[in-house]
């Protein structure tokens, strides 16, 4: 029995069923593409945007809060208690944001940079402790000498690694975006 021999009502029912199936298939493909795009956006936000902020807060704590406290105490712009509070806040910000960053999904390049950071963190933390000790002792001359000769060599290599981690966030977010564009193009071709 051929298609031509079917009653018109049967042919219309089959045509309608085919159209419904095609519409459902297009909808499923569209939803799948949207799900993939949403997952990519979620990854970009949770594993790139938030970590970018965390890395910047760690960087600022070392490069701005600690260094600024040392210079302001040395120059007389910060009373001792304010400098100590700033140093404590910097240490807390570093610990909180670094541990939160480590809880995200790291790509292989990040893992390598995190290892580098961990090695450089000990001397930078020692520098923070030394600055804190000098501030507690009201040793302005010692703080001036330390800031001039030892503070930056302990901090600068750390900043380079943090800068590289920022770049990894941007590069990985770009790659995720390009993947989403590819998914969109593939879905668009199907539809």
What role is predicted for each listed range?
Residues 21, 119-121, 161-162:
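Intrinsically disordered, low-complexity segments enriched in polar/charged residues with Gly/Pro
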Residues 155-166:
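Extended, hydrophilic extramembrane loops/domains of integral membrane proteins
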Residues 40-126, 130-154, 174-175:
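Membrane-proximal N-terminal soluble sensing/regulatory segments of transmembrane proteins
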Residues 1-53, 59-79, 98, 132-135, ...:
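Hydrophobic membrane-targeting segments
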Residues 34, 93-94, 158:
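Hydrophobic residues within well-ordered alpha-helices
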């Amino acid at each position: 029995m051929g298609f031509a021999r079917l009653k018109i009502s049967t042919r219309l029912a089959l045509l309608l069923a085919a159209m419904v199936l095609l519409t459902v298939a297009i909808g499923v493909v569209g939803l799948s593409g949207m799900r993939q795009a949403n997952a990519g956006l979620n990854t970009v936000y949770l594993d790139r945007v938030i970590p970018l902020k965390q890395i910047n807060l760690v960087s600022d704590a070392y490069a701005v809060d600690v260094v600024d406290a040392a210079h302001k105490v040395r120059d007389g712009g910060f009373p001792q208690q304010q400098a100590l509070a700033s140093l404590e806040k910097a240490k807390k910000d570093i610990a909180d944001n670094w541990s939160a960053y480590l809880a995200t999904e790291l790509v292989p390049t990040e893992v390598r940079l995190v290892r580098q950071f961990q090695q450089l963190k000990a001397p930078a933390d020692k520098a923070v402790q030394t600055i804190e000790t000098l501030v507690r002792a009201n040793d302005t001359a010692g703080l001036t000498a330390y800031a001039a000769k030892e503070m930056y060599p302990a901090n600068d290599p750390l900043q380079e690694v943090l800068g590289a981690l920022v770049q990894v966030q941007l590069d990985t977010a770009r790659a995720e975006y390009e993947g989403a564009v590819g998914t969109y193009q593939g879905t668009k071709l199907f539809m």
